[in-house]
Amino acid sequence: MRISKPYLRSTSIQCYLCLLLNSHFLAEAGIHVFIFGCISAGLPKTEANWHDVISDLKRIEDLIKSIHIDATLYTESDAHPNCKVTAMKCFLLELRVISHESRNMDINETVQNLIILANTSLSSKGNVTESGCKECEELEEKNITEFLQSFIHIVQMFINSP
């Protein structure tokens, strides 16, 4: 199964840079540069993850055109900015329905990758309690195309928020 982790792509370059700096600066300052460089290499770059989530959603849109899935999914059409984490969690739960209904390996892999990316991006906001938001089962049921368009809209809310 292919799991892409875009935030790890530049890790090896950063490690080589750290080693190079460490070999030239054996003083205390060089050690600090080395340590901070290695720490920064492992930190996720969450701002890029949301763009990758949108790419995966568009890939799913393209893949479902070739198969017929007659499922309706709980969809948040007009989420309030204060409810975006709750809405995102509902979308992620409903993605599993697409994966199950499609029985398509490409869709399954893309859905799994998307869930990992979104959860990684949500990790800093995942424990936020949002009051006054609808539960997943209270949302309107819509077809897959409308679901994916609404999902993209929610992801864009995360991209545009500070």
UniProtKB/Swiss-Prot annotation:
Residues making up the propeptide:
30-48
What does the entry list under GO cellular component? cytosol; extracellular space; nuclear speck
Which one Pfam family would you cite for this protein?
A: IL15
Q: Does the keyword Transcription apply?
A: no
Where does the entry say this protein is expressed, by tissue?
Expressed in many tissues including heart, spleen, lung, liver, muscle and kidney (at mRNA level). Expressed in many tissues including heart, spleen, lung, liver, muscle and kidney (at protein level).
List, alphabetically, the InterPro entries matched. Answer: 4_helix_cytokine-like_core, IL-15, IL-15/IL-21_fam, IL-15_mml
Q: Which domain of life is it from?
A: Eukaryota
Q: Which GO terms describe its molecular function?
A: cytokine activity; cytokine receptor binding
Q: What family name appears in the similarity comment?
A: Belongs to the IL-15/IL-21 family.
Recorded protein name is: Interleukin-15
Q: From what organism does this protein derive?
A: Oryctolagus cuniculus (Rabbit)
